[in-house]
Every structure is written in C-alpha cells, then in structure tokens.
Amino acid sequence: MLIHQISVTEHLNIILKNYIPHHSWERCAIPNTLKIKSGRDLPDIQSTLPDIRINLTRVGVKNVKKLVEVSRPEKRPVIFISNFDVFVDLPGSLKGANLSRNFEVIDEVLQQAIDGDVKEIENLCSVVARKLLDRHEYADRTEVLMNSQFMVKRETPVSHTSCHEVVKVHARAVARRTFREPIVRKSIGAEVTGMTACPCAQDIMKERAMTVLQNLEIPKEKIEAFLGEVPMATHNQRGRGFLCIEIDDDQHVKLEKIIRILKESMSSSIFELLKRGDESYVVLSAHKNPRFVEDCVREIAKKVLAEFKELPGDSLITIKQTNEESIHQHDAYAERQATIAELFYELNGDSTEG
C-alpha cells in the first residue's frame, strides 16, 4: 500500500526538528519532492551545499575501461583497448558532481565513433570534453585522458613474414568555458619500442679491432674497408620512445606519422618474429646506426619539424626516451618539452653559427 507523500515528509521533518538547531533547520529540512517508490523524484544530494565550501580542481572517474572502435572509409575499423579518466572542476557551492553524466557522454561519443561521426581517434577526447561542458552546467573546465593499446600489423624486412606489434596511444583534451564557444586544447601521442646501439662501446671495440688487425699486418686500406662494411660490436638497449603533440582543436595530427617518427629515430625497429635473414638485417642496421638516448630525442625533434611544418608555433611538443641498459642496472633517460617555435629557433640558430 502506498504511503501518502506529504504525511511521510512532514513526519520526518517533525522528527528532525527535535534534533537540529533552529538556525540550521532550513538547510537540512527534507524537500517536499521526496518520493518513496523507485522511479519517482528523490533529493539531488550532489546539488546541496557542502559543509566545507572549497572549489575542487578535478572531480571525476578514473580507469573507465572501454573498447573503442573507430570506423574508416573502405577499411576495417581500428580497435583500441582504452582506459579513460574524466574530470570536471567543481564550485564550492556544490557538494558533489554528477558522475553518471561522465559515463553517459563517453558511451555516446564511442557510439558516434562506431557510426563514423567521429572519424579519428585524435578527436575522440575533444568531443567528449565539449559534451561534458554541456552536461555539467556548473563546470568551467573539463578534462579527458585516454590511454590505449592497439595492434599494428607489420612485415619483417627480409622474409616479409607477417607479425603484430602493440603500440601505446595517449590522448588528452581540456575544454574551458568562455562567453562564446569553449576553448579546447587536445593532444595525441604514442609510445613505441625499438632498439638502440651504444656509440661509446662501439668506438672502444673499433679501436681494439684496428690494433689487432694492424698486429696481424693487415694493410691499412683493407682494415678501413672491412670496418666500413662490418660495424663493430657494442651493447644494446631496448628503447621506449614517446612523442606527444598538443594543438588547438581545429588542428590535426596523424597518429601514423607520430608512430613512424618514433620508429625511425632509434637505431633499429624490432619485431616479434624474425627469421635468420631478418635477424641479421636488424642487428646490422642497429650497429650501423648507433645512438645515445640523447640522440634519439634530438632526432625525434628534428623529424617533428620536418613532418609537421603546417602546425602553429604554439603547438607543444613532449619527447621522452628511456633506454633499458643491457650492461648496467640502471636505465638511460632523456626528455625535451618545447613549442614548435622554440625548436625551430634552436635548429636555425645552430645552422647559422657555423
């Protein structure tokens, strides 16, 4: 049997009045919109005043796992296994944010990606960030982060054997409310694993080889010819290169270009499966192209300037390289963060000083 709405609310308020001081009564009274049966209106606790009225920078959800499918014209869709972090700012006048709206927006945008309305993974986060501003009318700032993995089909260099590689993808968007249209900055990045060969140890081994060959009375020109064809041994590292580019929402950066730049900036690419000819090719290529961790970062920066000439000067570039040492217990690391304009100025300065 249904209990009459007014009698229940009045009864509860009478009980509360006996325990709550008079000056606090108006804020704590139960609103008349309370309904007992499910599916009817209930008080919106998130919209009430908090006990401590302090603004919060980020409120939201983390580690929302989703399967992201992005349609491509005349190609198979790209599938990403993704983790989302979604945040809004919260004014001190509200007790909490309505977190269920975050899930609703993510699902809506993911469906748009499947339908082909969101055609690029680079734009996914910016669309979510914009929609969050619409749903959270109290928020002035929204932020969306997406960390994903997807499989890239590859072919080995000699035997042309098919194999796959896992690439980590990072995307982020921040939307800020203005009196007109929201201002959105977005970023897209990737982390790729490759191989590096140490130039220092290789130079030491080269000097030793020259001494041994000279002691065997090998002619100097033959020694030089041999060392030119067969690079000396050195120790190797498994390198992890990271490149992220932050741009305005109306700009576009191809994820495929970022991945290619990272691969080409280490001593050699690596493959899950290698036949003997492939293995020889990869090892030889790496030792003919020795690089320090610092070299990798500088090479990435140079390639970014060559590949993305159309980007505005305030585009922010973040480059990181971690090399896992084979003969040491530590890892080598280098990093650079700069705008396109700053990198362009530095490279031009180097070229004019000579």
Spell out what each predicted region is.
Residues 12-16, 20-354:
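N-terminal intrinsically disordered, cationic/polar leader segments
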Residues 8-10:
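Acidic, Ala/Val/Gly-enriched low-complexity intrinsically disordered segments
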